[in-house]
Amino acid sequence: METYTASIRVLAASYYSPEQVAAWAPVPPDAARWQERLARLHTIVTESDGMLAGFASYTHDGYLDFLFTHPAFARRGVASRLYQRVESALRTVGTPRVTAHVSLAARAFFDRHGFQLDAEDCVECRGAYLRRFAMRKDLPNVRLVRLRGLTNR
């Protein structure tokens, strides 16, 4: 939770007002809400010297819910490596597309990684409205194969 909060409060602060940042990353965070949300997701973490450098959480149907880097590790390729691991995991299970709701702060990252814009909207978060982007990336090398009538011949 600390990496998430620090990332928003430091790295996204220039994209959002103080009120929006406070609503998006409240202090203290709601631990029960975090546990409930993460329980439904697959999470990949990366550490450096015992510190959480970043994490990514996703569903096997291709929704990338979280991709955050601790500010101490920003601009060092942590998010790119995490994203590559997510994409690899999704390809392995045959997921044809990655989707995400992306913040203003993360939009350029997702553009660089080949995502396409589907829609733009504002979402309400604890009384504040945050601009975000629905984005997707097709994984063209994934083939959906239906296995029928296989025998041991």
Which residues make up each language-model segment?
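Conserved catalytic-core motifs of GNAT/GCN5-like acyltransferases
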Residues: T99-H101, Q116-A134
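Conserved G/P- and acidic residue-centered "switch" motifs that form tight phosphate/ATP-binding loops
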Residues: G77
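Exposed loop/turn and edge beta-strand positions of beta-sandwich/beta-sheet ligand-binding modules
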Residues: R40, Y63, P96, Y129-R131
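Acetyl-CoA-dependent GNAT
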Residues: E2-A74, Y83-R85, A89, L104-A105, ...
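Conserved active-site tyrosine of GNAT-family acetyltransferases
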Residues: F110-D111, F115
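Conserved GNAT acetyl-CoA-binding A-motif
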Residues: L90-S103
